[in-house]
Each structure stands twice: as structure tokens, then as C-alpha cells.
């Protein structure tokens, strides 16, 4: 059985070294899902560090620069819509998280993941280092109470937002720079007017050409 998620993790209960992990874009209709992994040093100065959703875009960018500068190591993982449609959004999110961990300069002995799910065995085994697997724990609301997870949420969000700005210049008429791929009324109207583009998740409600087709819902 996977470890039970915790709503709060007292500092004394945290492993001495761990990577905080979070994602951005899981619930979007377009664009990739992006995950970040961050190992913070024992001492750092990042005033205002918290869940990325509680910050302005300008504050996120400022903190992201500080996180990249002070982190022991950090990494990003990206999974694009074609693979999201092929393996589903839950598995794509796991894959993005594993990719973020694999590019860290040092393998973490432990993973603290925002949410209520840990990496499944078939994904966790890809992170083996010299035969050792990291321990892992899911923490509900971790992006608001564990600084390394907060840092990961900020890096994932800022990187993905920049990707969506780039995609907006390539795929005109959808407003990606404004809504970042989320299912706003403006975005849904653009899909209805122009049809989906290569960056849309065709298995998601609101995008799929045939409303009677099998629906993929966000599993988290």
C-alpha cells in the first residue's frame, strides 16, 4: 500500500534531504503538463515563498529566479498533449515528475509530492540509483506548507506559462498567452470557432471533436 497522504508535515517529521515535487497544467485543455523537482539547502532566503497559485505573475517570476539561484539542484519535466492523450493525464503527470527528478544533479533520497498520490512502482523504479529507490510521501496542500514543494510549484508554473506564451505566437486565435490553456469561456469559444490545434488534448471534454466519444477526466 502506498503511504497515506498527510495534510501537514511538521518540520521535525521531514527527512533531512528531499526533493519537493509539484506540477502545473494538469487540468488544462491545451499545452503540456509540467513538473518541477527542487532540493533546497538547509538555509536560504526566499521571502514570500508559498503556493504559486497565491502569487502574482510578477512575484512568481521574481521568486523563480531566486529559487534557481539558491537551490541545491532543480529540474523540470514536460509531457506534451500527444502523450497525454495516449497514456492519460494521471500517467502523464507521473511521467513529468519522474523526468524532473531524473535531471537533478544529485539523486534525492526522498520525494515529497504535492497532492494525494505518490509515484506508482513502474514509474518509481525508473529513479533507481545504485539499486536504491527514493522514499516518497504525498502531502495534501504541500505546496502551501513545505517550502521545497512551494518552490517546485513556482518553477513548474513559470516555465509552463512561458511555454504557453510561445505557443500563442505559433497557434493564433486561441488566446494561449491569456488563459494558458485552461478551459475559459474565451478558450472554449475559440475551439468551437477554429477547431482544436496540435496543442489541444483531444481526449478532454470541451476539446474532443465528438462529444459522445470516451471522456478523459482529470484523475487528480
UniProtKB/Swiss-Prot annotation:
Compartment(s) where it occurs, according to its Swiss-Prot or TrEMBL record: Cytoplasm
Positions of a divalent metal cation binding: 22-23, 114
Named cofactor requirement(s): Mn(2+); Mg(2+)
InterPro entries: RNase_HII, RNase_HII/HIII, RNase_HII/HIII_dom, RNaseH-like_sf, RNaseH_sf
Name of the top EC class for this enzyme: hydrolase
Keyword Transmembrane among UniProt keywords: no
Gene3D superfamilies for this protein: Ribonuclease H-like superfamily/Ribonuclease H (3.30.420.10)
Alphabetical list of NCBIfam families matching this protein: PRK00015.1-3
Protein name: Ribonuclease HII
Native species: Nitratidesulfovibrio vulgaris (strain DP4)
Amino acid at each position: 500500500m502506498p503511504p497515506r497522504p498527510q495534510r501537514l508535515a511538521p518540520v521535525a517529521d521531514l527527512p533531512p534531504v528531499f526533493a519537493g515535487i509539484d506540477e502545473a497544467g494538469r487540468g488544462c485543455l491545451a499545452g503540456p503538463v509540467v513538473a518541477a523537482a527542487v532540493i533546497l539547502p538547509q538555509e536560504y532566503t526566499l521571502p514570500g515563498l508559498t503556493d504559486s497559485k497565491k502569487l502574482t505573475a510578477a512575484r512568481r517570476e521574481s521568486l523563480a529566479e531566486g529559487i534557481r539561484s539558491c537551490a541545491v539542484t532543480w529540474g523540470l519535466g514536460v509531457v506534451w498533449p500527444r502523450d497525454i492523450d495516449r497514456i492519460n493525464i494521471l500517467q502523464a503527470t507521473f511521467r513529468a515528475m519522474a523526468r524532473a527528478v531524473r535531471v537533478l544533479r544529485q539523486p534525492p533520497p526522498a520525494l515529497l509530492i504535492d497532492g494525494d498520490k505518490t509515484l506508482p512502482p513502474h514509474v518509481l523504479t525508473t529513479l533507481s540509483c545504485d539499486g536504491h529507490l527514493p522514499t516518497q510521501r504525498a502531502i495534501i496542500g504541500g505546496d502551501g506548507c513545505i517550502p521545497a514543494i512551494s518552490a517546485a510549484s513556482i518553477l513548474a508554473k513559470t516555465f509552463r506559462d512561458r511555454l504557453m506564451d510561445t505557443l500563442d505566437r505559433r497557434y493564433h486565435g486561441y488566446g494561449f498567452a491569456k488563459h494558458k490553456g485552461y478551459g475559459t469561456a474565451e478558450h472554449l469559444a475559440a475551439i468551437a470557432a477554429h477547431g482544436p490545434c496540435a496543442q489541444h488534448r483531444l481526449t478532454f471534454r470541451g476539446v474532443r471533436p465528438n462529444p459522445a466519444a470516451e471522456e478523459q477526466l482529470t484523475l487528480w
